[in-house]
Amino acid sequence: MPLILLCGFPCSGKSSRSQELQEHLEQSGRKVHIIGDHVLGVDRNAVYADSREEKDLRGSLRAAVERKLNKEDVVILDSLNYIKGYRYELFCLIKHVQTPHCLIHCITSPEVSSTWNQHRDKNEQYNQEIFDSLVQRFEFPDSRNRWDSPLFSVHKDEKLPLEQICNAIFHRKAPPPNQSTQMQPLSSTNFLHELDKVTQEVVTAVLSAQKTSIPGDVIMVPGASEKVQLPRILSMSELRRLRQQFISYTKLHPNENISQLANMFVQYLNQSIHG
């Protein structure tokens, strides 16, 4: 079912709007998934100070969105979504999945957002340098762009246009897929070989380590600095299913850095089994 994107300055009310949307949709019997930085438990100041970490975060959010998109549920992406190129990537994703979407721009002034930021708990605040940088880098949505449309721009004192949002996501046809979203972009035999090999090694390591592990343990796997966080014992069939999902996703969104495949798969496993 549909994807709802939130965008806006840091501390512009996106999470409050997401919760308001969730409550409204659940009252009508819809199942809603909210995905965002807070769900992944990231350190915002560390991530947004490092372009590589920020890129990894966007990839993790996109992967989490793709896992939840189906024919029944509504997915809300509660994040900055401040880069128009990233919003375009998500638009391509919904075209591939064949589901509608909309964008909600939470409008505040930098001064108001800065004040709201300062009133947050210390561990949830952006430091001022990061905050100012994100405000400066924000790329405003434009409803003339198909990836930013339909667009709902909501000021801080305005009510969400809930009826119009529901009409946009439930009574509008999904954008048709085009050749670029249907094509498999991979042609590198070496990449495919490494993808298959690395993911199989991780699965084998997890199955082996589980024999002497208990829920709550962390498992080291070959080729990864990330560790698998084990909330419960995972069956071979579940691991095989998650491995196949990861391979399918990575074929559509290839990463040139083969050395990071193991870490990416471990992150995918952790997000899937804890989600």
From Swiss-Prot:
Classify the source by domain of life. Eukaryota
Q: Does the keyword Nucleotide-binding apply?
A: yes
User: What SUPFAM superfamilies does the record point to?
Assistant: P-loop containing nucleoside triphosphate hydrolases
For this chain, the family text in UniProt reads: Belongs to the KTI12 family.
**InterPro entries registered for this protein in UniProt:** KTI12/PSTK (IPR013641), P-loop_NTPase (IPR027417)
Q: Does the keyword Metal-binding apply?
A: no
Any one GO molecular function term = ATP binding
* Source organism per UniProt: Xenopus laevis
- Kindly list the biological process annotations in GO that this record carries: tRNA wobble uridine modification
The entry marks the following residues as binding ATP, namely: G8, F9, P10, C11, S12, G13, K14, S15
The alphabetized UniProt keywords are: ATP-binding, Nucleotide-binding
Name the UniProt record assigns to this protein? Protein KTI12 homolog
